[in-house]
């Protein structure tokens, strides 16, 4: 059961998180929001952007703000799987006998920064697969559980591709979001330069801890989703498949392989968090449409025709959404989705939900 106290606590914690991150990272509002949503929802994040736009700084700031142990792994072509997961070493005891002792690798932390992940070989990249999905690490036949909460936040440079190894579909699918980190605006760039002239120190303080984060996730998971909204979200994911009964014309022309069921899971989990952040009891169609881009852009394999015409994944997603909105005759508004009350027992009109939201968050 969701109470007003739960929602108020969630709101205050989110405000504190964004405030503290903002002390370290200037601008990048959408990037910060996406990373926080994914972490609360329990997903991994792939940050893609050119060097110098603050990807690594953001991840380090997240570690401090959530007060969680942080490990950085710099991926290079000579990095081996054992350098990530750890390995057994021979240790001689006091009695003179030698035994194997496990030496944990940097993966045994709560927040993992996989810096320039596409520079490592596929063999090393695959060392993250089990950890990202099952939150376990198997070395020499022995599985070890990773401490919760556990996140992988990876970075990659989309421009410099020489000597890199594109991530395989199996690993890309394990990232809840792929977030594009853009260059700062002129005003943001001026603020960045002014700040760094004074100090380069990262000053964010802890806003919550691991237990708080798990509690926020539990609160978000309890948010109900209206059947109509859930069906719309699943239709959107299915519409990315060119051979699906829900296939859009854009997918038939430009998509070779659509999103997996993980996309649907990620979309709903993230939409619940976003609804709470916006002070609503319900997941709306707009939540689904906005989050479709980071959830789907890395899960679609494009056709040669799309590459030749330079049609991006985001443009295809926009076409699919427009076609689906027209097909289902829904309004792309937050008020289009049914609202479920805090008791999760009755469905009320949207106006009631909006009034409760204003009351909770002190908005006029």
Regions found by a protein language model. Give the residues of each.
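Conserved alpha-helical scaffold flanking the Walker A/P-loop in AAA+ ATPase domains
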Residues: 34-36, 91-113
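P-loop (Walker A) phosphate-binding loop of NTP-binding proteins
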Residues: 50, 84, 155
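Walker A/P-loop
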Residues: 36-77
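Canonical AAA+ ATPase core
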Residues: 91-95, 120-124, 132-223, 272-274
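Conserved C-terminal "switch" segment of AAA+ ATPases
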Residues: 6-11, 24, 164, 178-250, ...
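Pre-Walker A (pre-P-loop) alpha-helix and adjacent loop at the N terminus of AAA/AAA+ ATPase modules
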Residues: 8-53
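Walker B catalytic acidic pair
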Residues: 115-116, 127
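C-terminal engagement/docking regions of AAA+ P-loop ATPases
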Residues: 1-2, 243-364
């Amino acid at each position: 059961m969701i109470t007003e106290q739960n929602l108020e606590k969630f709101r205050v914690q989110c405000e504190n998180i964004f405030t503290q991150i903002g002390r370290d990272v200037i601008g990048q509002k959408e990037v910060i929001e996406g990373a926080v949503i994914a972490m609360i929802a329990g997903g991994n994040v792939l940050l893609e952007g050119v060097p110098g736009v603050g990807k690594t700084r953001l991840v380090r700031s997240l570690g401090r703000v959530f007060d969680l142990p942080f490990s950085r792994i710099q991926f290079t072509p000579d990095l081996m799987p054992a350098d990530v997961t750890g390995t057994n070493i021979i240790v001689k005891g006091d009695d003179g006998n030698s035994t194997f002792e496990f030496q944990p690798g940097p993966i045994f932390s709560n927040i993992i920064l996989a810096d320039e992940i596409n520079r490592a070989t596929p063999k090393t990249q695959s060392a993250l697969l089990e950890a990202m999905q099952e939150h376990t690490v198997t070395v020499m036949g022995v599985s070890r559980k990773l401490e919760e909460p556990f996140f992988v936040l990876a970075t990659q440079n989309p421009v410099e591709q020489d000597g890199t190894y594109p991530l395989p579909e199996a690993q890309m699918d394990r990232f809840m979001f792929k977030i594009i980190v853009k260059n700062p605006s002129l005003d943001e760039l001026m603020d960045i330069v002014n700040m760094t002239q004074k100090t380069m120190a990262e000053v964010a303080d802890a806003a919550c801890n691991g237990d708080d984060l798990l509690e926020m996730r539990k609160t978000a998971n309890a948010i109900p989703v209206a059947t109509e909204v859930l069906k719309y979200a699943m239709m959107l994911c299915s519409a990315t498949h060119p051979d699906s009964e829900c296939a859009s014309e854009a997918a038939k022309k430009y998509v070779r392989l659509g999103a997996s069921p993980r996309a649907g899971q990620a979309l709903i989990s993230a939409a619940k968090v976003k609804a709470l952040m916006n002070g609503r009891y319900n997941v709306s169609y707009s939540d689904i449409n906005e989050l479709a881009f980071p959830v789907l852009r890395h899960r679609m394999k494009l056709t040669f025709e799309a590459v030749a015409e330079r049609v991006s994944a985001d443009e295809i997603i926009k076409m699919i959404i427009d076609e689906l909105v027209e097909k289902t005759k829904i309004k792309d508004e937050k008020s289009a989705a049914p609202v479920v009350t805090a008791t999760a027992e009755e469905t009320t009109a949207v106006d009631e939900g909006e009034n409760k939201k204003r009351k909770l968050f002190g908005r006029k």
